[in-house]
Amino acid sequence: MASPEGTDGEGMGCCGWFQVEAIVERKTGDTISDDESEEENETDTDVDGFIDNTLINNTQEDRETAQQLLQVQTAHADAQTLQKLKRKYIGSPLSDISNQQTVYREEVKRRLILSEDSGYGNTLETLETSQQVEYEKGNGCGSSQNGGSQNSNCSEHSVSNMDIDTNMETPTHQLQELFKSSNVQGRLHFKFKEVYGVPYTELVRTFKSDSTCCNDWICAIFGVNETLAEALKTILKPQCVYYHMQCLTCSWGVIVMMLIRYICGKNRKTITKSLSSILNVPQEQMLIQPPKLRSPAVALYFYKTAMSNISEVYGETPEWIQRQTQLQHSLQDNQFELSKMVQWAFDNEVTDDSQIAFLYAQLADIDSNAQAFLKSNMQAKYVKDCGIMCRHYKRAQQQQMNMCQWIKHICSKVDEGGDWKPIVQFLRYQGVDFISFLSYFKLFLQGTPKHNCLVLCGPPNTGKSCFAMSLINFFQGSVISFVNSQSHFWLQPLDNAKLGLLDDATDTCWRYIDDYLRNLLDGNPISLDRKHKQLVQIKCPPVIITTNVNPMQDAKLRYLHSRISVFKFENPFPLDNNGNPVYELSNVNWKCFFERTWSRLNLDNDEDKENNGDSIPTFRCVPEQNTRLL
């Protein structure tokens, strides 16, 4: 074998090393190169070359270099650990470079579909997204030149895209996108059906006006905070007598659906403002309509869901749910009886057909017969028949009463607490002798011949019509107008009255009375023409006539002078500073007036003295039911 390079002889071990050092360093007889400094070997510091002083000077620098290296290594290790965590919890990076182009195309397609072309801003965002994807594909994610760093960049890009997609699916973002929709109500109805499984329109009836009041409402509120939804159950208790609340969660957040009955009727505006302030939800995220009260399906839905654990129920169940879900209420549903409707109209003195229909329909919640009336297809016929029968009964009852019984009957319907003095003071203010007026008024109420007509005469604005109208209103009398004198039936209202009034008679009217109505002023029986009915013979009731013309001063009306009694009202009607009458001529005061002057007007009836009970018999048109057990 060849000897090792740089050795002569067979030096081995340490001896060989020193021999090599001696040979390499310098040989005997070699010339010293000019490049070498002779002074360097001749100095006294040749011994210093054996000690390396640079190690002592550079110790601090070596330590700092080691710390920097350690920091770099630690940061690299942390980056690798973080990358592993991202791959584990977020998703693996794009490891296959050949599939990167396909993956990015799918991502771009997904992001383009998610974006809505609803404005200039959204279009720019879509273009910027596509340009950014193409730029990243050209910078390394689509090539294989960057190795591991390329995988790291692609992983970070996929993580950022995933964060964007996650943010777009939040409930707040979806509700914001809802407001951009052209049909917000449609999307709310669709979401309600998707969550609750029943269409909202099947539970409610539509109120077009926001000002219509109702006690029962069905409210659906979308995107409610969960804490506020729980607090709503406590806040609503002082405002309502019943609520049925359900809270379900979806991608939009919490959807609250409740059937609520308020203490008093409220409209949609009031409810919307109240719930919006409590739940911090805009009005566009609410559906508020009244329920279908006559739908068995709606009643059954709330009845069954109230027994489940998803509902929170407070208060007593509404009667419209009980009536349609409980057997007891189902057995109580009867057929319609016209006699009960007539009895109700007679007791409440409702004789007008429109009032009968409207007021009786409002009793459907508490009256089974009214409910059966609403279910009937012959409501118009029932209303007409009820009005006719009620008017027949009222007329027959009135004809059976004399004037004393009638005054007692109408006084029983007026409240207590009146004062008779304002009426007397007003008569004295007009210069009317109260004793003379009371004497004639007694004969006037009895219908004495030649004393059947009382005339109030005087200048305008003296209170003639006010005094007469207040008395007619108390007596529930009838008013006739001379403007209808061309008709044969203008006196027909006197057929059903205990007292009549002809207001503001002129010269022409007095000529007509002098020509055709002398018997009417006498208080004798007259023949009265009625529309669509045969002629009827009646005794004309007492009549009050107000006029600005004094018939006693007209010689052409001399045949009427013995048939009428004139009281002059010459002073202006007194008013206070607020424009109210100084002397109040109300029903309560007239009641007190008749009670005070009852004996002076000779209204005591012999039949009443014999019968200590009620002189007016109680009318009853409903057959009595036998409640005895068989």
UniProtKB/Swiss-Prot annotation:
InterPro entries the record matches: Helicase_SF3_DNA-vir, P-loop_NTPase, PPV_DNA_helicase_E1_C, PPV_DNA_helicase_E1_N, PPV_E1_DBD, PPV_E1_DBD_sf, Rep_E1_papillomaV, Znf_lg_T-Ag_D1_dom_sf
Keyword match DNA-binding: yes
GO molecular function: ATP binding; ATP hydrolysis activity; DNA binding; DNA helicase activity
Covalent link location (Glycyl lysine isopeptide (Lys-Gly) (interchain with G-Cter in SUMO)): 539
Region (Disordered): 26-46, 136-166
Motif (Nuclear localization signal): 86-88
Signal peptide: none
Sequence ranges of Acidic residues compositional bias: 32-46
Catalytic activity: Couples ATP hydrolysis with the unwinding of duplex DNA by translocating in the 3'-5' direction; ATP + H2O = ADP + phosphate + H(+)
Domain named SF3 helicase: residues: 432-582
Superkingdom of the source species: Viruses
Transmembrane domains' residue ranges: none
Annotated protein name in UniProt: Replication protein E1
Organism: Human papillomavirus 66
Gene label: E1
